[in-house]
Amino acid sequence: MRTVPFVFSLTALACAGQRSGQAPSPRAAGGDTTQSSSLGAGAASTPNANPFPSTYRPYPARTTVIRNASILTAAGPLIQSGSVVLRDGKIAAVGASVDAPADAVVIDGTGKYVTPGLVDTHSHLGVYPAPGGQALSDGNEATSPVMANVWAEHSVWPQDPQFPRNLAGGVTTLQVLPGSANLIGGRSVVLKVVPARTVQGMKFPGAKYGLKMACGENPKRVYASRGPSTRMGNVAGYRSAWVQAEQYRRRWDKWNRDHQGDAPTRDLGNETLAEVLRGNIFVHNHCYRADEMAQMMDIAKEFGYKIRSFHHGVEAYKVADLLARDSISASIWSDWGGFKMEALDGIRANLALVHRAGARAIVHSDDPSGSQRLTQDAAKGMAAGNAIGIRVTDEDAIKWVTINAAWALGLDSQIGSLEPGKNADVVLWSGNPFSVYTRAEKVWVDGAMLYDRADPSEQWRTDFELGFVPAQRGGTPGRNP
């Protein structure tokens, strides 16, 4: 038995990489074979639009069948005593009765549940890593209210020990955002929760970037002495930034069309905002109050961009019909509220009311501990809705942490539900995932089992934790929680 379970060591990886002719280790970091653009068809109008491409490479996977489990697919009704087949990194089959390939590893899921891998739309893992401290506090570039030129991925520390703890909670994909100090905080990045030496080795291939924007109290507080110091100052700041970005986009579009004279001077901030205007980057907007969400929708219409998701949104229930009308998702908590003035009107039925209105409700975390318990937060939102007469089923609530969140990241065709052809991001739970007594037992990413609660050798530890000696319990090596 290994003293240090599932050690992901940079030194070991570097040495392994020097052995010519050898295949990468099953636990080696993502290689450099997959380079995938994060921008869409309009990206050609931005020079070098993808300078930091994903180098993620799936880990070796074995054909696996989980039998006799209750399956919440996030695409239909609960399947009782069903089976899921994982093959070649994809969901090969799911249903009440499926054939098991002869070479498959068969897992008995009697009394257990299977769900898609969880998706967290709002994380700061890696940019505010553990242990907390100023030396590792890299989530807010609070030097100007508009910082569209910064990219969260350039602050992500892949050795953050919170990553493996999120995997142990069933999270397989997350969006890391800049903080909310600024009106425009910079680009977000979508990561797979996998061991890697670099952030590029974690980047979800082909995932679009996001733009973090923030309303309300946080920018006011941070910039009170420099401005903006009021909500009307905030709005003026957004609009000024978009005016400049639109002018920048037109200059580049004209040059790309005519190729006359010298190319316009590049500006990293306007480059990001121009990609939003072209539809290549999603807007993720930190916003608590209903009136401010409505104002941000108006600004988006003024400048012709789309808001993909409002984050936190404790008053989303007040404008749920507007969210549904404009196809804007709400990435929200189950029961956080009242902790500052703009959160005063938070209610526990927020998720259920957004869901009833036909908008996409999403449970997000904004917290390294909460992201380990996303299904428990979904359970609280489900209970609050049922308590006021809004029927929310397990089949509804699982979507709040899977397919709806995947949609907010533009990845719902690849992840977020258990359907043939989708990525085999799968969680086997010890019981109903909405119970506080349930734990994730096994977690697969692209068909590779990267977490096994019962086997310390299949539990990822970052380099930061090398040298950690598990506690001894009754003379046997302890296991990670």
Per-segment meaning from a language model:
Residues N48-A49, P53-R62, I71, A75-T115, ...:
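Histidine-rich, glycine-flanked metal-binding segment
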Residues T55, P60, A130-P131, S137-T143, ...:
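His/Asp/Glu-enriched, well-ordered alpha-helical/loop segment
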Residues Q162, L167-H311, R439, V445, ...:
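Polyanionic/metal-chelating signatures
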Residues K112-V189:
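Metal-associated gating/positioning segment near the N- to mid-region
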Residues A69, V84, G89, G111, ...:
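Divalent metal-coordination and catalytic microenvironments
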Residues Q18-A61, V469-R479:
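N-terminal pre-domain segments of enzymes
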Residues L13-A14:
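C-terminal motif of bacterial Sec signal peptides marking the signal peptidase cleavage site
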Residues A69, W407, E419-D463:
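C-terminal cap of metal-dependent C-N hydrolases
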